[in-house]
UniProtKB/Swiss-Prot annotation:
It is found in: Cell inner membrane. It is a multi-pass membrane protein. It is an enzyme of class 2 (transferase). GO terms for biological process: heme biosynthetic process; heme O biosynthetic process. Gene3D superfamilies: UbiA prenyltransferase. GO terms for molecular function: protoheme IX farnesyltransferase activity. This is Protoheme IX farnesyltransferase.
Amino acid sequence: MVTSTKIHRQHDSMGAVCKSYYQLTKPRIIPLLLITTAASMWIASEGRVDLPKLLITLLGGTLAAASAQTLNCIYDQDIDYEMLRTRARPIPAGKVQPRHALIFALALGVLSFALLATFVNVLSGCLALSGIVFYMLVYTHWLKRHTAQNIVIGGAAGSIPPLVGWAAVTGDLSWTPWVLFALIFLWTPPHFWALALMIKDDYAQVNVPMLPVIAGEEKTVSQIWYYSLLVVPFSLLLVYPLHQLGILYLAIAIILGGQFLVKAWQLKQAPGDRDLARGLFKFSIFYLMLLCLAMVIDSLPVTHQLVAQMGTLLLG
């Protein structure tokens, strides 16, 4: 427990204490995870999502992601201190003690599992818990500091939210959530390596073997291009052969996918261009958000009715 003396010495107020713990969770990362969870739930429920279940599932997912990110901050406190970009994070800055952060992280994880298992179902709780364990043990502990393919395998942790969302609605896992899992798994390397190209000097400084540091920029942008080529066709599997989504999603997925490929190709032609890397990184976020929004809209019954009416008018 943080004593009043320690609070007074390290923070100006209780609000500042809460802010430090909030920052431990890396809150900017969480919304994208929740968007993929929500999209999966909408598809699974065929556009008739149960609002209370949706909110509970998203809250459980938020707690799980916050737990995983806090554990990551604890483990990486040594390299966070060495990098100027991360030195101001709560633990290296001395605002939160590691043992207090650990208690906080474990409490978040337990609360996430309890909430999902009690009010949704056990499978969704177990999947959320597996995401925490995988992110911490496999990615943060085992892969991140030992292999240039860290983000490829480690990306599985960030691909779990659609499984949680689907399980929350159906209580099981069919082919569709695994396609969503694969889509995000393939999307992660282009997204993260574009960022790594911009901050590769930071990683080199602390001996973290990110691909741009180990293999260089040209090899990295080639890998980005290859993974991007896989992302687009995988996004279309939801239309055929799975028949989960229709023509509206198909049109949006093709347009977004085409732009994704254009940006990846432009970066491939100019590996050292940080602006192009930044552009791809930002667009990759935009891409996934809009793709998930298209999934939600396409799954709605009213969308099916409108598309059917338009088809009748065109054919009639």
